[in-house]
């Protein structure tokens, strides 16, 4: 198989900051994603709709954020993780390659954090490739249970001989994910990277 260029990005619902000083970043995010020139982009905290923010920001996109952010010619897949008073948000995948199928599984571990995984099957050079986008919990015991669920999901839903990629926001700075998933045959990407967390508002 040829090289597959992949990016993952928690877009924080397309908004930077909190309260009355928050600013709309979704248009800048669209430019950044175009510059990635990635075959696959895995996104977390993606708004499908948010009525309050759409009323607050003059240039709030008319399209759901996944469709708005997809570069020309890309396929956009979105599934909701969380329903709120004013809208809903979840994970998304943008793919240069055709999407054969997709599904969602709830990974919420407690009532304060609604989490889920988005599983898409892509056709890359005539080879089915499975991509799973996750956003794990903030609390370590929750992440451990979610990783156990992810292992079970892969064993159940992904053929043992199929290429599979897991990407997303792991909320993990101590290699917990790599250790927990090693037994599933997954390998950590060891290329150059730079930390994006901790930060005041990452």
Cite the ranges covered by each PLM segment:
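Active site of divalent-metal-dependent phosphoester/diester hydrolases
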Residues: 22, 57-63, 67, 72-93, ...
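Residue-level detector of structured alpha->beta connecting loops
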Residues: 37, 73-74, 96-98
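His/acidic metal-ligating clusters that form di-metal
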Residues: 119-124, 128-130, 142-168, 172-179
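N-terminal, active-site-proximal structural segment of metallo-dependent hydrolase catalytic domains
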Residues: 1-71, 83-88, 148-151
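Solvent-exposed loop/turn segments connecting transmembrane beta-strands
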Residues: 85-86, 110-114, 140-142
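Active-site metal-binding loops of divalent metal-dependent hydrolases
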Residues: 10-11, 45-46, 134-136, 163, ...
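Beta-strand-turn-beta hairpins that frame and shape the catalytic cleft
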Residues: 1-6, 89-91, 95-101, 113-133
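Surface-exposed cleft-lining segments at the edges of enzyme active sites
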Residues: 13-20, 49-52, 103-108, 134-141
